[in-house]
Amino acid sequence: MRILITLPWGERLGGAEAMLHGVLEGASHEHVELVFLQPGPWADELAAAGFRVEVVRAGRLRQLHRWLATVLRLAQIIRRRRPDVILNWSAKTQLYGAPAAALAGMSGRNIWWQHSIATGAWIDRLATLLPTRAIGCTSLAAARAQEQLRPRRRTFVVSAGSPPPETSAGAASLPAGTGRPVVGLVGRLQPWKGQQRMLEAQGLLRGQGHNFHLLIVGGDSYGLSPEYPAQLSTTIEQLGLENAVTMVGEVPDPGPYIQTMDVLVNASDPEPFGIVLLEGMARGIAVMAVNSGGPPEFIEHGRTGVLARSGEPSELAKALKPLLVSPQLRAKLARAGRDRYLRDFTDTAMRERFFAALEALCVQ
């Protein structure tokens, strides 16, 4: 099976990129080719690893002449390569890949990946309107949301996975004198990711006498919310949390920071999947998320982690409180979470699921 994947980003900063990178790390260089719509270090990294990589500078979608030129170039590549599967790794690349596949006479081989939970935004509606054999999703929640769009397209689900942590990687250093449980969030700084709500939850818990150090790992990836980091800093000052919060910004590898945490929180509501939670589970860290989106599909409340009833600060605080007061509970959840990860959510298991799903689509 020969696969041609179109990608919108030249950098590897978010969950969608992390999932695909994990898939590619075990893929055959001879059977997978990549077309990036912008240059960047990720494209260079994969080319250096031995993959056939082409970069087609697409520009912005609103630049119609650039869109047309990109579609025509992609159609040429598809005709030349004649892949068994054309996989557009986002709604954005579907807007280029689907017309290109049609021009090449291969619409029946076109698939796209919906990593987010569709909200009816114009780009999701337009991507769904274009021809596709199926739409891949990372969770049942994402698939159900996608199926609400029209025309209703066939969906399939491949749960993400995460590679085992490197044993040589040590923990990062935190400010001296922390001496309290460390609770962390890892992800780009955007309002829907919930850093603001988590700060407010920290303020509530502090008022109840439960102190912890909050570690926020991530930056303003892709410049999607440029004013948000300053907003978080203002909230920290207003709540008097200057000595109880560390913001480390964008880092190439969050693993050493995750290793310092007593609890890893995902405060998104909803979260499409939550690969970072798997990274915590793999390291034997207790995890907490919101009971919406993808996390409930692999976190069993009270057994392999904790699920807050919503992303509201009061509910986040209520869910986190038992973890703060009981090291024994944290250890119990961490052990069960790691067992769950090892059983079903390693990168090897993810690759097997992923390629089996594509093979099944090819033979139908």
What are these regions (language model features)?
Residues 4, 176-193, 199-202, 215:
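Conserved donor-binding/catalytic core segment of Leloir-type glycosyltransferases
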Residues 29-31, 195, 199-246, 325-328:
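A conserved nucleotide-sugar
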Residues 35, 286-289, 299:
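Short hydrophobic beta-strand element within catalytic cores of glycosyltransferases
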Residues 88-94, 114:
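Short His-centered aromatic/hydrophobic patch
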Residues 108-140, 149-151:
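A conserved, positively charged/aromatic
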Residues 250, 269:
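Aromatic "clamp/platform" in nucleotide-sugar-dependent glycosyltransferases that forms part
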Residues 291, 301-302, 306-313, 322-327:
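Conserved acidic donor-binding segment of nucleotide-sugar-dependent glycosyltransferases
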Residues 315, 322, 329-344, 350-353:
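A short, well-ordered alpha-helix in the C-terminal region of glycosyltransferases
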